[in-house]
Amino acid sequence: MKYDYIVVGSGLYGAIFAHEAKAKGKSVLVVDKRPNIAGNVYTEKQEGINVHMYGAHIFHTNDKRVWNYITQFAEFNRFTNSPVANYKGELYSMPFNMYTFNKMWGVVTPEEAAAKIEEQKKEISGEPKNLEEQAISLVGRDIYEKLVKGYTEKQWGRDCKELPAFIIKRLPVRLTFDNNYFNALYQGIPIGGYTKMVENLLDGIEVRLNTDYLEHKAELDALADKVVYTGPIDAYFGFKLGTLEYRSVRFENETLDIPNFQGNAAVNYTDRETPWTRIIEHKWFEFGKDEDGNDLPKTIISREYSSEWRAGDEPYYPVNDEKNGQLYAKYKELADKETGVIFGGRLGEYKYYDMDTTIASVLDMCEKELG
C-alpha cells in the first residue's frame, strides 16, 4: 500500500494534519513511537479521572477559527484556570489580583494596592540587569520574594540574579478580584479527556504505535510520497550539527484514598525549599465528577519537578536563547532542502507553542499543502 502522506507523531499537529488530508481524499499513515496516541496532550483514565499524563493542559484561545475547529471533535467544559500559590503555608490567589494584595498587605481598595506596588517598584532604578531586578521593577519586592523568586529558580535551576531580564517580560497585575489566569475568550477542557478528542480526529485513519520513524526511516519513506514530521528536528538529522536543548519536567503521580487533596486543580509551591514546583489534582479539571455526574471517591495528584534536560529525556520546552536559536536556524536550512518533508509542531519547529497556536499553525500549513 502506497500512501500520499506519512505523519510522524500523533499529537495535535500530526492528528489535525492527518484528519485534514483524509478529508481531502488523501491516504494517510500515522506512526508514533509511543504506545499511545495524542502526544503530550495524552490523558489516561484512572479511578474514573482523566489524568493529564504529560502535565496540565488547559485549552484557552482568543482565536475564533481555532475554537470553532477544535470543538467539532470534543465538547469542552467551562473549566477556568485559577491557580493558588502556596508560600510556606500562606495561600495566595493567582494571577496577582486584589485577593493577593489584600492577603499580602491588608489593602482593600485598588488605589491602595496600586500605591503599595508603585512604592515597592522604586527600589529598582534604571534598566534591570537580571530577572530579579526586572521582577521587582514590575511588581515590587514583597510579591517577588514570596511568589516569583523560589518558583522561578526551581523552574530554571538557577538564581534569579543569574537569569536574563527578558525571561519575564511582564507580570500581569490586576486591580480587580479576577482569578481567571488566562485572558482568553474561549477556555475549557474536553469532556472525557484529550485522548478521546484526538481519537475523533484520527477516526478512520491507520495508526501504527510503538513505531520509531527514525529507526525505520528508509522502509517507511518508501511507503509514501510525502512525510509530515513532528519529532525533534535535530534528531531527524542525526544531531549532526549538535543537540538542541530543552527544559524538561518530571512528574510523580500518586493515587490517594481521599476525595479531595488540595481543593484546586493547580497549586504552585513558590518557596525554594519545597522541591516540586506545583501539584496538579486532576479531578478538578472536570469538577471532581465522573461522566455521569457522580462524585469520585479517590483523587490523583501529580507533583511536578523541573529538571535539567539530558539527551534521552522527554523534551518539553525549547530553550529560547541565542545559542539554541542559532543552532535551530542551521537545522532549519537543512530542513528547507529536504524535499518531500514538512517539519511542524513544537519539536519540528523548535518553538514554544500553546495548543491553540499549534492548531492555528497546522491549519495554515494544511491550506498551503492541501489547498
Question: What does each of the following model-derived ranges do?
Answer:
Residues Y3, G25, I205, L223-D225, ...:
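Short, well-ordered alpha-helix to beta-strand connector turns
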Residues Y3-V30, C366:
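N-terminal Rossmann-like FAD-binding beta1-loop-alpha1 element of flavoenzymes
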Residues V41-V51, F59-A113, L171-T176:
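A conserved beta-strand/loop capping segment in the N-terminal third of enzymes
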